[in-house]
Amino acid sequence: MEVTPLINLDNHQTPLFWCPLPDFLLRRITEGLFHDLCKGKNQLGIEFGNEYGRAFERYVGRILYEVFDLDRFAITGEQPYKVSGQIRHGVDGIVSDATGNIFIECKTRRMKQGAKETAEGETLEKSLDELAVAVVQLYKNIDDATNGLSEWIPNGRPIYPFVITYEDWYLFTPQVVNQLNECVQHRLEAAQLPRALTETMPFFVTSIGEFEMAGQDIAHLGIERFCAAGVISEYRHFQLSVLVQKAFPNETIVHRHLLKNSWGEIFPKMQEWAGMAGMKEGW
């Protein structure tokens, strides 16, 4: 129903449609256009599904440069490298400071609706295993980097793996998180990597919406201080932006709206409309 939110229950096929979940209809005509784009190709024959992923990676990159002060943080994008003659693309991004490193994998894949509605079952297991593929790919890239196979130069500081997703995966129950960890450990074993990586180098899963806020917290606190608190928190996989409120209640961090110039280009009248509504900001 995410793809076809309008249904016709009439056997005589009269032009009468029902919309059981109006929210699905709204999403279908906005972000749901992805379902149409991913099936097509551009004039060069490149599938839009792949381009969609690339566009998301570029967006995450823009957020990194918007959030992190380059006087204190170093930001590195994707840097392909060769291993035994084969090209590997490596991580999608790395953010480093004097205390630690964040290795980033971007994923547009979403949790299927059926998986969101249950805490068990085949649909959920399949979705979690798809996410586990991304997590293990990130661990593989980190393994290459720490062994000197990539362009990144190891600095001896702790590494925190971050999978940044387009949508939230709602990983807020211990049961679901445990299932995800099991999927990751099975795939780590298949990739001949230590299962214990989930304990020695715990991974984060966060949506880009959450990261836009949490990234500002990281920029304020520093990588190691924020992430060390995060690895022992229930917010490591869900609502990462709430972590600071719970772990650092005495810290005052003023969050700002990001990419204001882009918003102004897309919605040139937004500030005027916001003024009419008595709002300080148009977004």
Task: Write out the residue ranges for each language-model feature.
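Active-site beta-strand-loop-beta-strand hairpin of nuclease catalytic cores
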Residues: V95-K116
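A solvent-exposed, charged loop/short amphipathic helix patch at secondary-structure junctions
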Residues: M111-L131
